[in-house]
Regions:
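PP2C/PPM-type serine/threonine phosphatase catalytic domain
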Residues: 1-311
Length: 311
């Protein structure tokens, strides 16, 4: 559900403050990039126990340089490999807004559009350094806002106005840094040194009231405004929150839609991540737990980590 349904669609920008300030440029890690065999990522989505349609979509992709050969006199086997090792990963999760037409189409459109934009950022993230970090974040933000405009145009064309809308939470893992872009009430978490950190904040009317001092956090959890989005792609307002932070080898990241956090507490999420054996196992466990407790919404969970060195 979106707030201010009669408001004029607009775009804007903001900087997230969910985590401490990023490491200064001189503090960039010089530790080697993890090898592909060390990376363990997995994503899972489920319609839940109540909803007929799954309006969640997600994507996990590794980032490479690629040479596409159209013709050659050289045997194909002699030309491999033509894809470089991964330079990083991108995680995307989008939750179509209920109560609006084509929530599933909106979330799918956003995933496809952002994936398309990412392919055109190759040169920028390949040469990423402290001096270009702000430019990179600005490019990500621009891609998100252009996708917002795309959804508005689709809504005008298909429905004469109010079309589909969706949340979006995106994590770029580009060693030794991580970048988050966020709209709505999906979420991104990081387990570091055994402590769970929320890297995003919900963009709901209830959360805005809490920040304004008009509502206590305990009241927000029960408030009907807790399900009313103050910001979403394709909605009346789209205000991306962006964050740059450091990445460490012992980090575990988790992205999810609110179908998980409606039924599973942050303490429980932290407990599962602390005892993680594989990204797939923890995704399946958390989705199952949400469904066991009612599964009132679609639920999507993405997890990524660097495997610990074998002893």
């Amino acid at each position: 559900m979106l707030g201010s349904p009669e408001a004029t669609p607009s775009t804007g920008t903001a900087r997230a403050s969910a985590l401490p300030p990023p490491v200064p440029p001189g503090g960039w890690s010089t530790e080697p990039r993890p090898a592909p065999a060390e990376i363990d990522v997995f994503g899972l989505t489920d319609s839940g126990r109540v909803r007929r349609e799954n309006q969640d979509h997600f994507l996990i992709a590794s980032l490479h340089k690629l040479l596409r050969v159209h013709q050659s006199s050289i045997p194909p086997d002699d030309l491999t490999p033509l894809v470089t090792e991964s330079r990083g990963f991108v995680f995307l999760v989008a939750d179509g807004v209920g109560g609006r037409p084509d929530g599933a189409q909106a979330s799918g459109t956003v995933i496809r559009a952002i994936a398309h934009y990412v392919t055109h950022l190759t040169d920028l993230y390949r040469r990423l350094d402290p001096d270009r970090e702000s430019e990179f974040l600005a490019q990500l933000e621009r891609a998100v806002l252009e996708t917002h405009d795309l959804l508005l145009k689709e809504g005008l064309r298909e429905y004469g106005g109010k079309g589909g809308a969706t949340t979006l939470t995106m994590l770029f893992a580009l060693w030794p840094r991580a970048y988050v872009v966020h709209l709505g009430d999906s979420g991104c978490f990081r387990l570091r040194e055994g402590r769970l950190e929320r890297m995003t904040r919900d963009q709901t009317v209830a959360e805005a009231l809490v920040r304004a001092g008009a509502l206590r956090p305990s009241e927000a959890r029960q408030s009907p405004f807790g399900n009313v989005l103050a910001s979403a792609l394709g909605g009346p307002e789209a205000t991306p929150l962006t964050l740059a932070t450091d990445a460490r080898r012992d980090d575990i990241v988790l992205l999810c839609t609110d179908g998980l956090t409606k039924h599973v507490t942050e303490d429980e999420i932290a407990g599962r991540l602390r005892t993680l054996q594989s990204s797939e196992q923890v995704c399946r466990d958390l989705v199952s737990l949400a469904n066991e407790r009612g599964g009132t919404d679609n639920v999507t969970v993405l997890v990524g980590r660097i495997r610990p060195a074998s002893r």
